[in-house]
């Protein structure tokens, strides 16, 4: 089970690859309307979670592609290229060559320390769609409810995209992911500083957030 996150439209001109809109309020010039989730809507979200994981790992970016002229029916078929996976296990897969060897090692070490300290499993995939292992990473990483899959892909503007397991979703405010994407994933940031800088900054921010005590104000600031 998983939740998908994208930055809100105001923070990204293009549609982000992995899409789930958590906006609970729409503001007009005359009023602000609060939307409450009904029991039926909650059931729908639950069903969506169970189906969303396979769509994310397909690498098809189905909803995003539908805005680029590719229909959902075609996009949802997805990508499954296990030949793009490394031969040995690693928590960082960079098929787009955004990261240097040293950066990959630093990120992998940070991820290992995080998993040891918290039990949460962060996994990083850097890609340029459609060059992606797609569905194959699900089994390669043995993705479960304690896993955060961070996909760095600049195809649709904002480079930061997240698939968050249900256990993680219980502890981390949902707004954290959109705020993180807005700060380090926007096109202006990664074009100026580089894709590698966006990836490293996001990993450190996630690590810092996951180490904070769970409470009303955890992850309030993006480190």
Curated annotation (Swiss-Prot):
Transmembrane segments: none
Localization in the cell: Plastid, Chloroplast thylakoid lumen
InterPro entries, alphabetized: TPM_dom
Keyword field: Chloroplast, Plastid, Thylakoid, Transit peptide
Main location: plastid
GO cellular component: chloroplast; chloroplast thylakoid lumen; thylakoid; thylakoid lumen
Pfam families in alphabetical order: TPM_phosphatase
Name recorded for this polypeptide: Thylakoid lumenal 15.0 kDa protein 2, chloroplastic
Organism: Arabidopsis thaliana
